[in-house]
Design a protein with these regions (language model features):
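A conserved acidic beta->alpha catalytic loop
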Residues: 23, 30, 38-47, 66, ...
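Glycine-rich, basic loop-to-helix element that forms the pyrophosphate-binding segment
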Residues: 64-81, 88
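Short, well-formed alpha-helical segments that are part of the catalytic scaffolds
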Residues: 12-26
Length: 435
């Protein structure tokens, strides 16, 4: 039995896969197995998998003839894994030098349920850069599980990526911590369940993983009904089920509820786009899971969603909620129809706000965003600019600008509000849209 199983779902990554696999083969630690799950690739990825499996006895390949999304591929990999610990690697990323030694040393020192890892970011040209969070090493060394869960929940928007964690395989199997199949935001479901079930944690203090954001071509690069809205609702429901079944209390309940609120907020940003057939499917999902929706009453904002479906039923309630989201968004610019409207920043929330306003007949000039990488990009037909462009506008034209700050994070709202004020934007020149 190897110490470590590396499970890698593979789908159309012929330009990245060899670097990923070579970063494993170059490790100085060798007590591992690699399980490649070729998820019905249509490029040369399957052949690359076969070549490595033929040359190296600790690399295995499983070919799927129907794509089952990353969740299905990971579950198949987990079923075939033999290692004491499991790591799920993305096939377009790779490992840092000596990272397996960091992992093995951590395992042999403490044998935790879950190991939390750090990463470095190497984006492709034109892709966005992401910074790692600053973990408090002392909290992990004190081994107070509740304190660790609370600490991780403080970074909840940043840590919901499967590759951050190495988990004890028997712990995963015993607690039935698998991936929600048929949906695309499986990380958002798996990570909270993992964190809220684990009793022991350890932290690898050195970055062990290299995350490579891609400019385009990833499975989640396009926001659609199938890969976002439907998945967000299903994932939120799955977490509510987990909350009820495990009877989570204290910080664990608070953490799960915060992720549900986040997911329902994302769901709200696209509900204006739903067509009739999608509304019917979503209503059926809601109808089948109404028993879990009582929890939503405890969360502000998502309570509105619950109120509509509880009072009017899943189908009419969802339709009324969609109308409510549109009207609440339009309300933010009421009386400023004649001004140049900008949305600040980009992202699910900002892009949803811009789309709703455009579809309701408002002229949106563009986005403001603090990302240098996004500066000059075109998103949904709108140009992205740094907020500093406001410095170059004379007072008369500046007074004719109206900005909607659109995000889910209240602490970010205050930062952006103060930034706009420093650029001579007055209080009556911006509104805040939180989903």
């Amino acid at each position: 039995m190897p110490l470590l199983s590396i499970v890698i779902p593979v789908y159309n990554v012929q330009n990245y896969l060899e670097q990923c696999l070579n970063s494993i083969l170059d490790q100085d630690f060798k007590d591992y197995e690699v399980i490649l799950v070729d998820n019905a690739s249509t490029d040369k990825s399957g052949g690359i998998c076969d070549n490595y499996a033929l040359e190296y006895e600790n690399i295995k390949v499983i070919h799927l003839y129907k794509n089952c999304l990353p969740a299905g591929a990971r579950n198949i990999g987990l079923k075939n894994a033999m290692g004491k610990y499991v790591h799920f690697c993305d096939s377009d990323d790779y490992y840092t030098k000596n990272s397996f030694s960091y992992i093995s040393n951590t395992i042999n020192e403490t044998f935790p349920d879950v190991i939390v890892g750090k990463f470095i970011c190497k984006p492709e040209k034109g892709a966005f850069h992401f910074n790692d969070v600053n973990y408090n090493i002392r909290i992990f060394k004190e081994m107070n599980t509740d304190a660790i869960v609370e600490h991780l929940s403080n970074f909840s928007d940043s840590i919901c990526t499967v590759w951050r964690f190495i988990a004890n395989r028997k712990f995963l199997i015993k607690n039935k911590i698998t991936f929600l199949e048929g949906y695309n935001c499986e990380d958002e479901e798996w990570v909270p369940k993992l964190i809220c079930t684990a009793n022991t944690f350890s932290l690898i203090e050195e970055p062990f993983y290299c995350y490579r954001p891609r400019k385009s071509g990833s499975i989640t690069s396009t926001k659609t009904y199938m890969n976002s809205s439907r998945s967000q609702l299903a994932t939120a429901i799955s977490l509510l089920k987990f909350l009820k079944e495990k009877n989570c209390i204290g910080i664990r309940k608070k953490y799960i509820m915060s992720r549900v609120k986040f997911l329902i907020g994302l769901f709200a940003t696209r509900c204006d786009t739903f067509i009739r057939s999608e509304m019917i499917e979503l209503a059926k999902i809601i109808e089948d899971n109404m028993e879990y929706f009582n929890c939503l009453k405890e969360i502000s904002k998502t309570g509105e969603f619950f109120d509509f479906v509880n009072r009017y039923g899943s189908c009419i309630g969802l339709a009324l909620y969609r109308t409510y989201i549109i009207e609440k968004t339009v309300e933010k610019v009421y009386g400023n129809e004649d001004k140049k409207i900008y949305i600040f920043p980009t992202g699910y929330n900002g892009e949803g706000t811009a789309r709703i306003l455009k579809n309701e007949g408002y002229k949106v000039e563009g986005f403001l965003d603090n990302s240098n990488t996004k500066n000059g990009c075109i998103i949904d037909g709108l140009e992205v600019n740094l907020p500093s462009i406001l410095k170059n506008i004379d007072d008369e034209k500046l007074s004719n600008i109206f900005i909607v700050i659109s995000t889910q994070k209240r602490q970010v709202v205050e930062i952006l509000r103060n930034q706009l004020k420093s650029l001579n934007i007055k209080e009556n020149q911006f509104a805040i849209r939180i989903y």
